[in-house]
Curated annotation (Swiss-Prot):
This is Rho-related GTP-binding protein RhoC. Belongs to the small GTPase superfamily. Rho family. The lineage of its organism: Eukaryota, Metazoa, Chordata, Craniata, Vertebrata. The gene is RHOC. It is a lipid-anchor. One of its GO terms (biological process) is regulation of actin cytoskeleton organization.
Amino acid sequence: MAAIRKKLVIVGDGACGKTCLLIVFSKDQFPEVYVPTVFENYIADIEVDGKQVELALWDTAGQEDYDRLRPLSYPDTDVILMCFSIDSPDSLENIPEKWTPEVKHFCPNVPIILVGNKKDLRQDEHTRRELAKMKQEPVRSEEGRDMANRISAFGYLECSAKTKEGVREVFEMATRAGLQVRKNKRRRGCPIL
């Protein structure tokens, strides 16, 4: 039986952990060097609830320089992973300010999974000290859950690509969300612009 194909697009601020999350899930290796993404695609197979799904993973650049290029990734999207970094409260602030309006404009009705990346840094002393200098602290789980409710996300999960904690769960939830396409519409993804 052929696998069901679904398209997942990941968005969020630059350096918030999007590419690491995709690479750890699809290739099971953590990239130690940060190279800003312009545009990358990965394919990963996943089984959820007895269904074989081929996930096309579309990585995007979070940097503002790519704001005009990024919408080219959106057509026919089945599910969005909207990411912030737990060690960057500013990246959480950009979820309602930048990412939600952009995604809801280009992908109305496409389910959004809000993902808190770099969970391992929440208890990291160096991270806490650096944030304290700016009178900030790592994002708390309840802040993430509140944001997910605020933007009407399908769900909220936290993970660490570095330790692999929670990575598979993110993609299982995303796949389930992508499979919940209403049967009465042939295709519910983002329209082609």
